[in-house]
Amino acid sequence: MFPRDARLDMYDPELAKAIAAEVRRQEDHVELIASENYCSTLVMQVQGSQLTNKYAEGYSGKRYYGGCEYVDIAEQLAIERAKQLFGADYANVQPHSGSQANQAVYFALLQPGDTILGMSLAHGGHLTHGANVNVSGKLFNAVQYGVNAQGLIDYEAVESLALEHRPKMVVAGFSAYSQKIDWVRFRAIADQVGAYLLVDMAHVAGLVAAGVYPNPLPHAHVVTSTTHKTLRGPRGGIIVAQAPQEALVKKLQSIVFPGIQGGPLMHVIAAKAVAFKEALEPAFKVYQQQVVKNAKAMAETLMLRGYKIVSGGTENHLMLVDMIGRDVSGRDAEGALGQAHITVNKNAVPDDPRSPFVTSGLRLGTPAVTTRGYQEQDCVDLAHWIADVLDAPADATVIAAVREKVAAQCKKYPVYR
């Protein structure tokens, strides 16, 4: 029925052209969006396998459909590898995304109208941590904490807010915070008010797995994550916990299915299993160590060039460039760097006077360039080129010169050989 040698460019040339252009973009542009990475050819091979054809509602050994004996193997491999990777006693690999993993935990442990205490989106948090434009901020009474004048989480303020509002859940984690989080302190705050502690480690899961960032599992009631970003797997979500009570496990299992999802994506779950196996390899730890070294090199160089980094540096894979007071906005900087084939994203910074669609900041991250093979000196060079463009965002000559240097660097470090 379906020939295995069918060619997309012959059947759907418009789509094939768009895909080919994206492949070229990924090879020819430097990727510095902190939430992006390149997964392996093995991950892509499995995600494009015939497992996409199989419906498998339920869990391994307890499906609502027949013929699941082989996808059961794939899911169980993903579960056991995730548990080994993070030191977990429980893992659910079915969430379709990190946002759905967070949603599952909220619905499992809270009632609509309950109070949650999460990091403000404007100060480095995530939409799903109680932002008023997200369902987490609409269904729940969301109280938000932030960073102090030094750009660091204000734990005293978090504690004060917790004592004042008595949340049912405290949410720790971020999408744009460059320092280490004190999970012990967060658990102590949650315990003071009898709240659950949910940690969203989506951005640092790969660093945690490699032991180069503190593991939240011994301290949180529940931990969620994406499976891409620093973990370098397929796009998806995961829920893990260490020594959870049986009642908590039952709530989490039943809320993922049938609570908020139907059939799991078995081809994605199998790809997660491959990514987790890759993350258990010794080379993955070396990779994550280099991610942090590269981020530090980039942040230090940008600061030497006169650019402010929120919190004064980085201890993970990302940094937030604060351009408040400068003529160039985050949006304009993103556009100018894009012309130089450096891909970044505009980002709000603490106390940003500009709108979220314009912003006064840039978020930069090193997971993708480190996957390509970049070392510290490459990131120092790249940071200088970024500063060159930010110093003269409307200068076509500067942009062209940087674009030429980027092309040579990308050619030196191809994504897929």
UniProtKB/Swiss-Prot annotation:
Record keyword Methyltransferase present: no
The UniProt record lists the keyword Transcription regulation: no
GO molecular function: glycine hydroxymethyltransferase activity; pyridoxal phosphate binding
Cellular compartments per GO CC: cytosol
Pfam families hit by this protein: SHMT (PF00464)
EC class of the enzyme, as a word: transferase
EC number, UniProt record: 2.1.2.1
PROSITE patterns hit by this protein: SHMT
Pathway(s): One-carbon metabolism; tetrahydrofolate interconversion; Amino-acid biosynthesis; glycine biosynthesis; glycine from L-serine: step 1/1
GO biological-process terms attached to the record: glycine biosynthetic process from serine; tetrahydrofolate interconversion
Plays an important role in substrate specificity (site feature) positions: 228
Localisation per UniProt entry: Cytoplasm
PANTHER family reported in the protein's UniProt record: SERINE HYDROXYMETHYLTRANSFERASE (PTHR11680:SF50)
Protein name per its UniProtKB record: Serine hydroxymethyltransferase
Entry-annotated residues carrying N6-(pyridoxal phosphate)lysine: 229
Cofactor needs: pyridoxal 5'-phosphate
Subunit relationships: Homodimer.
Keywords, ordered alphabetically: Amino-acid biosynthesis, Cytoplasm, One-carbon metabolism, Pyridoxal phosphate, Transferase
Family to which this protein belongs: Belongs to the SHMT family.
Record-listed (6S)-5,6,7,8-tetrahydrofolate binding positions: 121, 125-127, 355-357
